[in-house]
């Protein structure tokens, strides 16, 4: 006689339980997906391709036919593309078979460029100038350390960039032998599964302005005490919004 009474709570629980919503899983999958375009072919270079004007990659995948050496420091000779001052690279996919990705020797524009697997760095901004570097659209994933390494001076503008599974999206060089004041402006970023979005040297007057969304990113903006001694690692000063790190906390989830 007690069985109906025991079953009643179970029936009520089932009746009022939240039904399975298949769109929930789809939303999570969508959030975690990497929207890299389909490749239109592949090109392997035996040496870096130098660009002095505008190069449209036609959404082909470009590489060097070599195995990534991890965080072992490479150089310009290991890059896929080397951009001269004022050059533009657009509509290209950088494959996993490379070490240094893209080098800019001065101001440059990187538009709709995607890195399937970052090796040492995805994009290295070199030179001694104080111009503007623009990264528009595109994305990168699987960077053990940095995606964008800013060694030169000037401003970096990053718009509508997608980054996943990374150490840092942007890092102003912490121990270059010649230091500069550097500025980074990030808008429309979509970041997930990272250690830090931005690292700057506030003692040199660096500033970062950030907007967009971030999911599972431990720190958004980290300030360091930069040094010109390249045998010394820069010390971390602080993390979070400040006069140097300009953003509203928390950033929205992606």
Swiss-Prot record:
<protein>
    <recommendedName>
        <fullName>Probable pectate lyase E</fullName>
        <ecNumber>4.2.2.2</ecNumber>
    </recommendedName>
</protein>
<dbReference type="InterPro" id="IPR011050">
    <property type="entry name" value="Pectin_lyase_fold/virulence"/>
</dbReference>
<dbReference type="GO" id="GO:0045490">
    <property type="term" value="P:pectin catabolic process"/>
</dbReference>
<dbReference type="InterPro" id="IPR004898">
    <property type="entry name" value="Pectate_lyase_PlyH/PlyE-like"/>
</dbReference>
<keyword id="KW-0456">Lyase</keyword>
<keyword id="KW-0964">Secreted</keyword>
<keyword id="KW-0325">Glycoprotein</keyword>
<feature type="region of interest" description="Disordered">
    <location>
        <begin position="228"/>
        <end position="254"/>
    </location>
</feature>
<dbReference type="Pfam" id="PF03211">
    <property type="entry name" value="Pectate_lyase"/>
</dbReference>
<keyword id="KW-0961">Cell wall biogenesis/degradation</keyword>
<comment type="similarity">
    <text>Belongs to the polysaccharide lyase 3 family.</text>
</comment>
<feature type="signal peptide">
    <location>
        <begin position="1"/>
        <end position="17"/>
    </location>
</feature>
<dbReference type="GO" id="GO:0030570">
    <property type="term" value="F:pectate lyase activity"/>
</dbReference>
<dbReference type="GO" id="GO:0005576">
    <property type="term" value="C:extracellular region"/>
</dbReference>
<dbReference type="GO" id="GO:0071555">
    <property type="term" value="P:cell wall organization"/>
</dbReference>
<keyword id="KW-0624">Polysaccharide degradation</keyword>
<keyword id="KW-0106">Calcium</keyword>
<feature type="glycosylation site" description="N-linked (GlcNAc...) asparagine">
    <location>
        <position position="175"/>
    </location>
</feature>
<keyword id="KW-0119">Carbohydrate metabolism</keyword>
<dbReference type="InterPro" id="IPR012334">
    <property type="entry name" value="Pectin_lyas_fold"/>
</dbReference>
<keyword id="KW-0732">Signal</keyword>
<comment type="function">
    <text>Pectinolytic enzyme consist of four classes of enzymes: pectin lyase, polygalacturonase, pectin methylesterase and rhamnogalacturonase. Among pectinolytic enzymes, pectin lyase is the most important in depolymerization of pectin, since it cleaves internal glycosidic bonds of highly methylated pectins. Favors pectate, the anion, over pectin, the methyl ester.</text>
</comment>
């Amino acid at each position: 006689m007690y069985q109906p009474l025991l079953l009643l709570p179970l029936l009520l629980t089932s009746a009022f339980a939240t039904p399975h919503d298949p769109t929930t899983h789809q939303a999570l999958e969508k959030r975690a997906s990497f929207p890299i375009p389909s490749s239109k072919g592949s090109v392997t270079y035996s040496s870096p391709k130098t660009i002095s004007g505008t190069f449209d990659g036609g959404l082909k995948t470009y590489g060097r036919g070599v195995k990534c050496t991890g965080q072992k420091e490479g150089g310009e000779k290991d890059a896929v593309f080397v951009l001269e001052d004022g050059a533009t690279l657009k509509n290209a996919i950088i494959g996993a078979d490379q070490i240094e990705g893209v080098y800019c020797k001065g101001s440059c524009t990187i538009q709709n460029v995607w890195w399937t697997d970052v090796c040492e760095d995805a994009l290295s901004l070199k030179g001694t100038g104080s111009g503007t570097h623009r990264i528009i659209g595109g994305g990168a994933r699987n960077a053990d350390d940095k995606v964008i390494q800013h060694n030169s001076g000037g401003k970096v503008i990053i718009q509508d960039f997608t980054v996943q599974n990374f150490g840092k999206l942007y890092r102003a060089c912490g121990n270059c032998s010649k230091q500069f004041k550097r500025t980074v402006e990030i808008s429309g970023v979509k970041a997930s599964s990272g250690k830090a979005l931005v690292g700057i040297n506030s003692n040199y007057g660096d500033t970062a302005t950030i907007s967009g969304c971030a999911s599972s990113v431990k720190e958004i903006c980290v300030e360091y005490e930069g040094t010109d001694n390249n045998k010394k690692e820069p010390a971390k000063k602080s993390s979070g919004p400040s006069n140097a790190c300009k953003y509203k906390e928390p950033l929205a989830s992606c």
